[in-house]
Design a protein with these regions (language model features):
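Short beta-strand segments
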Residues: 124, 211-217, 265-267, 304-306, ...
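Active-site loop/helix belt of alpha/beta enzymes
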Residues: 31-61, 218-370, 437, 464-466, ...
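Non-catalytic peripheral regions of nucleotide-handling enzymes
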Residues: 1-27
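Charged (often Lys/Glu-rich) extended helix/loop segments that serve as interaction or gating elements
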Residues: 328, 334, 342-497
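Active-site-proximal loop/turn and secondary-structure-junction residues that shape catalytic pockets
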Residues: 127-129, 150, 171-173, 192-194, ...
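Short acidic, glycine/serine/threonine-rich loops at helix termini
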Residues: 133-134, 156-158, 177-182, 199-202, ...
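A charged N-terminal "starter" segment
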Residues: 28-211, 256, 260, 441, ...
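Hydrophobic residues within beta-strands of alpha/beta enzymes
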Residues: 144-145, 165, 188, 264, ...
Length: 497
C-alpha cells in the first residue's frame, strides 16, 4: 500500500510546451440530456458530446482557468505542479491521490481578503478542511466557517483564532453548541426556534453570552443544482423572510438575556456565476435589517451574504473575478442602505469552493479501456480508473461536469469522445461524463481531473470498502502529506463483528 513520504524533492522544474493542432474526429455533436442520476448511464446511451464541449484543436492542451497556477505540461506532455511531475507523484504516493497546489490555494485566499478589504472573509471549511489548510487560510487573513463539531475540532487543532470562527449547521447538537461556547467561537449562526431556545438555556448555564446571527432564506432561486441551491423556500435551512419567521427569530434572539444578536446571515447556494441572485438576496435581507431597526430602535451591526462563488470545471464555465464581485456587492449594499436610511453594517462573506476547488486536481491510473458503439455509428470510449464515486460523488449526486487530461505523456492520436468511470459496482459511477481524450489512452496511463479541491475529499466515502485517497500538497518542488491514505486495515479496525 502506498503512503506518500512526507517530503520529496522534485528532479527539476516544469517547462511550458506548445502542442500542434489539427486533430480529426468523425463523430457528431449533440446535446446530452440528464435524467435520474442512478440511470444516467442508460439515459445517455444514444447521446453525443454536449454542446458546451468543443472538439479540441489539441487534445494535449490544458485550459488554464481549470487548473491551479502552478500546473503546466512539459514538452513530453507530462503534467507538473509546482515543479513536481505527476509521474513522480504517482510513484511516491500511489493513485488515486488528491494533489493541492499550496501556493495557489494561499493566493486565492489572499485575493478574497484583498478584494473584500474591510469585510470579514470566512473560508467555508465544508469545501475542504484539514489542519494544514485551516492554518494556511488563517495565515492569509481569513476566518473559518465550520458546521460540525468535527470541523471545529480541526480549527482548534490548527490553532486558529477561534474568535474568527463561525459555527453553522441546521441541527447542531447540544454537545456541538457546548463545544462552540466553551471554545469561544466568534459567532453561532442559529437556524431554528428550537436552536434559539437550546442555545439560550446552554449559554445561561455556562454564563457565557453567545454571539449569534440569524440564518434567513431570501426566496432567491440561484442558478445552480436544486440540492445546492439553499435560499428557496422549500428546504431545510434558515428562517423564511416571506413567511415572517425571520423577523420573529430576530426578536426572539434580541429578547434572550444570554444571546448577543449580531446580525443576519443569508446564503443563496453554490456554484453561482451571476451577481443577480446576490443582489436580490442582499436587498431582501437589508429590508429585514431595516424593519428590525425600526421595530426595536437598534441597528444590527453585522450582515453576512454567504458564499457560493462559482469556479470553472469545464470550458463552459466563466467564474467572476473576486474584485469585480466585491465592487458590485459593495455598490448594492451601499445603495440599498442609503435608500433604507440605515448605516452600512459590517459585512462578511464565506467563499469555500472558489478557494479550494481550482487549487487541486485528482490523479488516477487507467485500468481498463473499452469502446461502446452508439446509435448512428459513433462510439464512446469508457476509461476506467482506480478511483470513482467514493472519492468524488458530485457527478453522480449533482450531474456535475468535470474535465480530464492525459497526464503522463504526449499523444499524437486524434481526440475521442470519452467517459471517465470508476471501479465501483454502480452504473452511475462516473467521474467525467464527457471529455475528448486521445484515442490511444491505454491501461497504465495517468489521468488528471482538475478543479477537484472542493467537495471531493470532503464528501468521499468508503463505498465498496474502498479506502479514501491521500491528500498531498506541493510547493517549491516539495511534496507534503496533508491527509494520509486510508488502508483496508483502517476500515477493518472499525468493524466490531
Amino acid at each position: 500500500m502506498y503512503q506518500c513520504r512526507s517530503r520529496v524533492r522534485a528532479t527539476g522544474p516544469s517547462s511550458p510546451r506548445r502542442a500542434p493542432a489539427g486533430w480529426i474526429w468523425s463523430g457528431t455533436l449533440d446535446v446530452v440530456t440528464h435524467t435520474h442520476v442512478a440511470g444516467s448511464i442508460h439515459a445517455d446511451a444514444t447521446s453525443r458530446a454536449p454542446g458546451w464541449l468543443p472538439l479540441p484543436d489539441d487534445v494535449n492542451a490544458l485550459l488554464p482557468r481549470l487548473w491551479s497556477q502552478g500546473v503546466s505540461k512539459d514538452a513530453d506532455g507530462v503534467l507538473t505542479v509546482a515543479g513536481v511531475s505527476v509521474t513522480e507523484l504517482a510513484e511516491q504516493c500511489g493513485t488515486p491521490v488528491y494533489v493541492v497546489d499550496e501556493d495557489d490555494l494561499r493566493a486565492r485566499a489572499r485575493t478574497f481578503a484583498e478584494a473584500f478589504a474591510g469585510w470579514e472573509v470566512y473560508y467555508a471549511a465544508k469545501s475542504f478542511l484539514c489542519t494544514a489548510v485551516a492554518r494556511w487560510v488563517a495565515e492569509e487573513g481569513l476566518g473559518l466557517d465550520v458546521c460540525t463539531g468535527g470541523e471545529l475540532a480541526v480549527a482548534q487543532r490548527a490553532g486558529v483564532n477561534l474568535s474568527r470562527v463561525g459555527l453553522h449547521g441546521n441541527n447542531k447538537s447540544l454537545d456541538e453548541l457546548r463545544q462552540g461556547l466553551t471554545a469561544g467561537v466568534g459567532r453561532i449562526i442559529v437556524d431554528s426556534f428550537d436552536e434559539i431556545e437550546r442555545l439560550s438555556a446552554l449559554a445561561a448555564e455556562l454564563e457565557v453570552r453567545a454571539r449569534v446571527m440569524v440564518r434567513v432564506t431570501t426566496g432567491v432561486e440561484a442558478h445552480t443544482h436544486e440540492y445546492i441551491a439553499t435560499a428557496h423556500e422549500d428546504q431545510k435551512f434558515g428562517f423564511s423572510i416571506a413567511g415572517g419567521q425571520a423577523a420573529r427569530a430576530l426578536q426572539a434572539c434580541a429578547d434572550a438575556e444570554w444571546l448577543d444578536l449580531r446580525g443576519i446571515h443569508s446564503h443563496i447556494g453554490s456554484q453561482i456565476f451571476e451577481p443577480d441572485g446576490f443582489e436580490v438576496a442582499a436587498r431582501r435581507t437589508l429590508r429585514l435589517h431595516a424593519e428590525h431597526a425600526r421595530a426595536t430602535g437598534v441597528e444590527l451591526p453585522e450582515l453576512d451574504l454567504g458564499g457560493g462563488f462559482g469556479i470553472a470545471y469545464t470550458s463552459a464555465d466563466s467564474p467572476a473575478d473576486p474584485f469585480v464581485l466585491a465592487r458590485a456587492l459593495r455598490r448594492i449594499v451601499e445603495a440599498e442602505c442609503a435608500g433604507l436610511e440605515v448605516a452600512v453594517p459590517h459585512l462578511s462573506i464565506e467563499p469555500g469552493r472558489a478557494i479550494s476547488g481550482p487549487s487541486a486536481f485528482a490523479l488516477y491510473r487507467v485500468g481498463t479501456v473499452k469502446q461502446v458503439l452508439l446509435d448512428g455509428g459513433a462510439s464512446r470510449t469508457y476509461v476506467a480508473v482506480d478511483g470513482g464515486m467514493s472519492d468524488n460523488i458530485r457527478t453522480a449526486l449533482y450531474a456535475a461536469e468535470y474535465s480530464a487530461t492525459l497526464a503522463d505523456r504526449r499523444s499524437d492520436a486524434p481526440p475521442a469522445l470519452s467517459r471517465v468511470v470508476g471501479k465501483h459496482c454502480e452504473g452511475g459511477d462516473i467521474l467525467v461524463r464527457d471529455e475528448f481524450l486521445p484515442a490511444d489512452v491505454r491501461p497504465g496511463d495517468l489521468i488528471a481531473v482538475p478543479a477537484s479541491g472542493a467537495y471531493s475529499r470532503s464528501m468521499a466515502s468508503n463505498y465498496n470498502h474502498v479506502p479514501r485517497p491521500p491528500v498531498v500538497a506541493v510547493r517549491d518542488g516539495e511534496v507534503a502529506t496533508l491527509i494520509r491514505r486510508e488502508t483496508v486495515e483502517d476500515l477493518l479496525a472499525l468493524d466490531c463483528g
